[in-house]
Amino acid sequence: CLVGSEMCIRDRRTLKFGFYTVILIEGHAEDFLYGRKYYDYSNASLIFLTPGESFKADKNKILSQKGWLLAFHPDLLYHTSLEANIKNYSFFYYKPEEALHLSLREKTKIIECLCNIGEELQHAIDCHTKTIISRYIELFLDYCTRYYERQFITRNEPNKLIINKTDLLWDEYVQSGKLMNGILPSAEYCARNLQLSPHYFSDLLKFETGKNIYEYFQQKRFETSKRMLSDKNNTTALVADKLGFSNVQYFSSLFKKITGVAPNEYRISQN
């Protein structure tokens, strides 16, 4: 495990770390780097990298800001609670442009966590060292999770636009016939079209709607079926086929289970 303070980022070369890596870059109000928008905080930015992932400083600006670096090898996680929990910190799979932007208070708390890790690294190694360091790292990452959730709140309006664009993607997916094979849009498909990382998109969707991507599109599928049945030109069989249900009997059974009426009855009631 390594904690570096007063790190100075001046190199534009691509850097590659063989560790889990967190880079804290101290920022200024006029800097709009790593996805920061005018509505984000500007005191510092946190970028997260998985082992083997590359990082390149923003090409639009020579970075001379000072910062911190936390790096820890995957082996450090063995037989610790962090080994099981590391997968929950999905921001390690975000793009650098999806960085976490900190307020002054948040930055102070993050640096305090880093100092605690650094202090423990200076302690003589004993049977407690690995446990204490891993718990400090886990606490640090829990704070990062809290602050990312705060950032989702700060970005509420832009995030609503992303959800609206997701709904448009769904409509296009259905209209193009892609759903007829029964495969719902994936996080990768949506993220690619929205120019986001799959993990960031999935976390944003969950935060805004309370649903994972499968649950969200299943709901959209049902809403679309009701809308299509409202058109008297659409038969139950056509709707089932267009929305990728394996057969009309399964669709009818599921529709009645959810609404209490059969598709044909619903269709008649709407027309």
Label for each model-derived stretch:
Residues 207-249, 268-271:
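Terminal helix-turn-helix DNA-binding modules in bacterial transcription factors
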Residues 44, 189-196, 201, 205, ...:
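Append "Primarily bacterial transcriptional regulators
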Residues 92-138, 143, 147:
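Amphipathic alpha-helical segments enriched in hydrophobic/aromatic residues interleaved with Lys/Arg
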Residues 9-95, 126:
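N-terminal regulatory/effector-sensing and dimerization cores
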Residues 252-271:
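…primarily DNA-binding HTH/wHTH and HhH modules…
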Residues 134, 156-194, 216-234:
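A short, Lys/Arg-enriched amphipathic alpha-helix from helix-turn-helix/homeodomain DNA-binding modules
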Residues 1-4, 8-9:
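Single conserved hydrophobic/aromatic residue that forms the stacking wall/gate
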